[in-house]
Structures are given as C-alpha cells and as structure tokens.
Amino acid sequence: MRRQIESDMATDISTRRTDAVGECSEDAVLGGRLVLRQPRRGHRFGHDAILLAAAVGARAGERAVEFGSGVGAAGLALARRVEGLDVTLVEIDPALAALAAENAERNGLAARVRAVSLDVTAPRAVFAAAGLASASADHVLMNPPFNAAQNPSPDPERRAAHVALDRTLEQWLETAARVLRPGGAVTLIWRADGLADVLTALSAQFGAVVVLPIHGKAGGPAIRVLVRAVKDRSAPLALLSGLALADAGGKPTAAAETVLRDCAALPLI
C-alpha cells in the first residue's frame, strides 16, 4: 500500500463511496463527543489516536495536518477539542479516506475537516496539488507504522497500517518538515523501545523535543512515547513524568480518563 501515487489521485475524496471498507461498526469516543464509523476487519483505532490528539498544542485559527489518518480518529478528536482549528486528514487508502470524510460530516466537523487520499511520501508537487503546499501548516500529527517487518500481522489491512518499511519514520518526518511553517510542531506516538530512533530521525530538522512516556499500568514500563518537536528550533530535550493508563489493579486512572473520556489536553502542550 506504500505506493507512489500520481497527482490526479491527490484529491479531496469527500464524495467518494465507502463501500470498499466492508462492514463497519460505530464507536463512541471522548465520552460520546465523537461517534466514528470504522471497518470491523483490519486496522481499528484505539487509545493511541486519542492520546496523540490530546498532545497537539493547536489553537483556533491554525492549521493541522494528520498523516496516515485512517478513518480520522486523531484528527477529528483534535478538531473536537480545539474549536476554530482547520484540519486536513491525509490517508493513502481512498476507501478509508472517504470514511474519514464521512466521519467528519456525521460529527458536524466537515466545515473545518477535510480528507485527501495521498501517500505521505508523495512528491512536493502532489502535496501542493492537494492543497498542502510547503510551509502551510502549523502542526503535523502522526502515528506512523512502527512494528518490525519480521513480525507482521496476517491481516493485510493491519499489516499495511502497522508494519514499518525501510525509512518510513524518516520519510514521514521529512514530509512533515516540508509541510510545516518555521516554528511549526510535529507530534507523534511511537513504541517506547523505539525512542532512540525517533530522536535520531528528528535531529536533522527539529529541536525543542518534549517526550511523555505512556505506561500501560502504574509502576510498569512505558509502552508508548508521545513526542513533540519544533521545526528549526534548538532547545534541550524535556522528559516529562509519565502517564499511566491504569493503576496497578488494572483500573483506569483518573488522569487517563480525563484525556480519553473528557477530551482534556496532555502536558506536552
């Protein structure tokens, strides 16, 4: 699925059919503030998308772009939290991009959120044709594929969404740097054991890095890291106290529920 696409495919897909995704479920997130359709089979969004949205420090009047948006969970959650924010959802799969556009419409966000079917690694001209010119965004958010190729899912949709190819992270960050204005921020979620790879990939064009570890249970190891960095800025790395999703007994923590259910922002902002 990580194919190069031609410029005539880099189009707004809000009117395309969503039949190709097959049977869908409707899932409420953010305490019912969003209800999203997503395929029952293949990749399905989870906590990662909502945590990612909560970590983006966007404000009204700015523009955010989500790379690899799937059905739009993170970008739509961000748009729901930040009134007046313009969001573009970038998704390589036309059927999922169409479903993301449908989700924006169903949740009353279509005036501020649009979806385009576009490969994140497409050339500059293809992005510009899709309304994503260089230095045009204030924020880029992403949840890139991060699983090793030697441990792929047998499901092709899950495999495409989760398995990182050579230089996937570097390529996505290169595109983010191109799309962002000077001083714009990229925010991503990644495996905790891959933090060194993220920091290395960011070092070429980003600085002022902030890292928030995410723990599955209090007292346990981090399972994810949320990372924010600023284009063309230099400042020491800041490592924040981690967020535990559950206490030692497995009960959701109040801090996690505030983000996952109550649409609160995370301290990277």
Task: Give the location of each predicted region.
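Short, low-complexity, intrinsically disordered N-terminal peptides in bacterial proteins
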Residues: M1-V29, V126-S134, A265-I269
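Conserved beta-strand segments of alpha/beta enzyme cores
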Residues: V35, D86, R112-R114, G207-V210
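Mobile active-site "lid"/loop adjacent to the S-adenosyl-L-methionine
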Residues: P144-Q171, T175-R178
